[in-house]
Amino acid sequence: MTKLLVGLGNPGDKYFETKHNVGFMLIDQLAKKQNVTFTHDKIFQADLASFFLNGEKIYLVKPTTFMNESGKAVHALLTYYGLDIDDLLIIYDDLDMEVGKIRLRAKGSAGGHNGIKSIIQHIGTQVFNRVKIGIGRPKNGMSVVHHVLSKFDRDDYIGILQSVDKVDDSVNYYLQEKNFEKTMQRYNG
C-alpha cells in the first residue's frame, strides 16, 4: 500500500511561512521527523520525499505548480502510482476557521480555496480525505489575497505551531490506524 500526503502552498522563499503555506509547513514537519529530504521532480511538478511506515510507502508532496494549479501534481501522482482516492490526504489552510483550529473531513466543496478547487477539477471528485488548518479571516479591511499571502503575527504563529503539532499527531494516528473515519472521530472532538 502507498499513501500520498499533500501539503498545499506556494513554492519559493517569498511565500515561506505565509498563511497560505501551512500545508507546506506540516509536510516539512513530517519530513523532519522522518529524517527525509525533498527532491524536485519536474515531471510531477512537485517536491517529493518518501519513507516507509509499517510496510507502507508514504509520499510527502509539495506541489510546485503554485496553489491554483495544485490539482495537476496531485492527479499526475495518483495516476502514475495507480493510487485510489482513499490513498490521498490533502493538508491546507482554511480562512473560515479560527487560527490554529483543525478539522478533518472526508469530503466537501472547495469552499473558495483555489488549491482545493484545482484538485477537485483534476481528480473529478470532492470525496477525498483532508485536514484543514484555520488561518482566520482578514482583519481591518485587508483583502483576502493580502491576508493569505502574509506571514502570521507572533501570537498567531504560536497557535499555528501548536496546530501543526496536533495535525502531525492526527496524520501519524491515521497512518498507524489506516482508518480516516476513526481519525476524524478522535481529532475533530
Swiss-Prot record:
Its EC number is 3.1.1.29. GO terms for cellular component: cytoplasm. Coiled coil: none annotated. Pfam families: Pept_tRNA_hydro. TRNA binds at Y15, F66, N68, N114. It is an enzyme of class 3 (hydrolase). One of its GO terms (biological process) is rescue of stalled ribosome. The record marks D93 as: Stabilizes the basic form of H active site to accept a proton. The record marks N10 as: Discriminates between blocked and unblocked aminoacyl-tRNA. It comes from the Bacteria. The active site is at H20 (proton acceptor). One of its GO terms (molecular function) is tRNA binding. It is found in: Cytoplasm. PROSITE patterns: PEPT_TRNA_HYDROL_1, PEPT_TRNA_HYDROL_2. Keywords: Cytoplasm, Hydrolase, RNA-binding, tRNA-binding. It catalyses: an N-acyl-L-alpha-aminoacyl-tRNA + H2O = an N-acyl-L-amino acid + a tRNA + H(+). Belongs to the PTH family. PANTHER family: PEPTIDYL-TRNA HYDROLASE (PTHR17224:SF1). Hydrolyzes ribosome-free peptidyl-tRNAs (with 1 or more amino acids incorporated), which drop off the ribosome during protein synthesis, or as a result of ribosome stalling. Catalyzes the release of premature peptidyl moieties from peptidyl-tRNA molecules trapped in stalled 50S ribosomal subunits, and thus maintains levels of free tRNAs and 50S ribosomes. Monomer. This is Peptidyl-tRNA hydrolase. It comes from Streptococcus pneumoniae serotype 4 (strain ATCC BAA-334 / TIGR4). The gene is pth.
